[in-house]
Regions:
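Short, acidic/polar
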Residues: 9-20, 74, 159-167, 310-320
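Conserved, mostly hydrophobic/aromatic
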Residues: 24, 47, 78, 117, ...
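Alpha-helix-loop-beta-strand connector modules within alpha/beta enzyme cores
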Residues: 41-61, 113, 120, 343-350
Length: 350
């Protein structure tokens, strides 16, 4: 089992990434949401220059913020700084789009973006289209020492909804899941990933599946309010994404369907002007717990979507996730969480 740490991209992420590397973490993941955090590629470049072994990935980029040749160039450049340590994590762009008041990218756009980037990063000449104009493109100076196309850059596709999960299984080298800690939610996502993988002649076991989530060690008598402050921001984000990712709620696991769908409007104020309502809804996203989310973030949903509990409970849950097919768990946090996770999980399970 590999272990990762999740950062809300900032220019000093390299300090925590280097600390995590020293503590035995294998991966570091950086949020890409231009209206919320710092620029992901600048933060990753700093981390690449300050670390030696930890792998660095986007969590996650998308097809809309940048055209595919720019995305590919970013990763080819990072691959010069950290050869063989770079991973492209990509999805449809939930917050990076919704913080603009825009919808997430379409699956066809995601597929095309991945295909163009994969081709360019392998040194191929690939078709590229804007509107009705279709041209062939390639990196023109691959051996100039400006970019690195020699070390492979794996592409992991993020998903929560059935169709996106199946596409991830079909076209991804790996799949990124959010908050799929409990058996029913993890089993639901893996079944769709398997379906997509089989469509491409692959097995689920061929894919690198990782779960990004929150982590909190509980203390005796700890209140629900304390847990909500600790992991509530990520619980709300993860569950909201699941609720928005289905066209028919019946597609979700029956035992937690209603709990998940309750998060559908977590970041929506129906009475606010449509032109500006998104400006307030995502302030403090994934970092601050908002009072209006208190009724939604129950003990049950905390257990279903995060690694919250005693050290023994968390280790047992990770073992179960590994048995089901997960190859990495990545947790959000700074130095205190990194230290606790390294002490109570990595040293015991690694």
């Amino acid at each position: 089992m590999d272990f990762g740490v999740i950062f809300l991209s900032h220019v000093e992420s390299y300090k925590e990434a280097a600390f995590a590397e020293a503590k035995g973490f294998t991966h570091a993941w950086f949020g890409d949401s231009q209206m919320v955090w710092a620029d992901v590629y600048q933060c990753m470049a700093l981390c690449a220059s300050k670390t030696t072994t930890i792998k660095l990935g986007t969590n996650v980029t998308n097809p809309s913020s940048r055209i595919a040749p720019v995305t590919a160039c970013n990763f080819a450049t990072l691959n010069m700084l950290a050869p063989g340590r770079v991973i492209m994590g990509i999805g449809t762009g939930n917050t990076s789009r919704r913080t603009l008041g825009m919808p997430a990218a379409k699956l066809a756009e995601l597929r095309t973006h991945v295909e163009v980037c994969r081709g360019l990063l392998s040194g191929a000449t690939v078709p590229y289209q804007e509107g009705e104009r279709r041209r062939m493109i390639k990196f023109l100076n691959p051996d100039s020492g400006l970019i690195n196309l020699k070390n492979p850059v794996p592409i992991y596709v993020a998903g929560s909804g059935p169709k996106t999960l199946e596409l991830a299984g079909e076209i991804g080298d790996g799949v990124i899941l959010f908050g799929t800690v409990g058996d029913s939610l993890l089993g639901y996502t893996l079944s769709h990933i398997r379906r997509g993988a089989e469509r491409a002649g692959k097995r689920l076991e061929d894919l690198y599946v990782l779960v990004l989530t929150a982590f909190h060690l509980t203390k005796p008598g700890e209140s629900l309010a304390t847990l909500q402050q600790a992991v509530g921001p990520l619980v709300t984000s993860e569950c909201n994404i699941f609720a928005l990712s289905v066209t028919n709620p019946d597609e979700l696991p029956g035992d937690i369907r209603d709990d998940l769908m309750a998060f559908k409007n977590a970041y929506r104020t129906p009475n606010a002007p449509i032109e500006t309502r998104h400006l307030d809804l995502y302030t403090g996203y994934c970092a601050e717990f908002k009072p209006e989310h208190t009724p939604l973030v129950t003990e049950r949903m905390i257990k279903e979507t995060t690694l919250t509990g005693t050290p023994e409970e968390i280790r047992a849950r990770i073992r179960k996730m590994q048995a089901m097919g997960v190859k990495q768990v990545a947790v959000a946090g700074g130095v205190p969480e990194i230290t606790e996770f390294a002490t109570h999980v990595i040293q015991e399970l690694g």
